């Protein structure tokens, strides 16, 4: 099983965490919107 990696908008962190995703980076800007990398191991 391969881990799934996403670039999520920061305000959706709790939403993705509810599915088991874990924060895997510091915040970064993409198109002036705050994002974080998340991984589902």
Where are these regions (language model features)?
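Conserved active-site tyrosine of GNAT-family acetyltransferases
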Residues: 16, 21
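Short, high-confidence coil segments that cap the C-terminus of an alpha-helix
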Residues: 1-3
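A secondary-structure capping/hinge motif
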Residues: 23-25
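C-terminal "cap" of GNAT-fold acetyltransferases
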Residues: 6-13, 27-41
């Amino acid at each position: 099983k391969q881990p799934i990696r996403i670039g999520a908008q920061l305000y959706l962190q709790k939403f993705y965490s509810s599915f088991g995703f874990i924060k895997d980076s510091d915040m970064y800007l993409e198109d002036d919107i705050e994002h974080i990398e998340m991984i589902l191991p």
